Amino acid sequence: MSVAGVGLTFFVVALFLGPIYGHSILYRDANLYFHLILPLVSMIEFVFLYIPKESLTFKHTFLTMIQPSVYGLAYLLNIMINGKGEWPNTNDWYGFLNWGLGVGLLIFLFIVIASWGISCGLRALNKQTSRLFSAQ
């Protein structure tokens, strides 16, 4: 469910990066589309307009944990190989390691679990609206 990936982008920017760096910076220019408009439109489209040909099973929701896991491992590997660096030339461009490696790993774990949670929520909402529209 790729829509969970863009949903994750929306929630990370809105709830984590926005309060730290400022929403006005993260929603400027093209980022307005990437961080706000496209994620919201895709989630709304999935919930209200997408009618799956086959039922999306609960097992499918776990697949959404793969992408942030791979991305997070590549992110950490980049920092391990190249070093964290100093702002503004840092390899930790999200600032996840500002509070140390332990907190950074907890943030990484939370993001992977949040991706799964978003997928479960979207699946449940889609199931409800699909039933509603198919009953008419």
Predicted segments — roles?
Residues 80-83, 87-123:
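Membrane-interface transmembrane-helix boundary segments in multi-pass integral membrane proteins
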Residues 14-24, 80:
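Juxtamembrane "helix-exit" motif on the non-cytosolic side of transmembrane helices
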Residues 1-5, 57-65:
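Interfacial segments of alpha-helical transmembrane regions
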Residues 28-40, 108-109:
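Membrane-interface loop-to-helix entry segments
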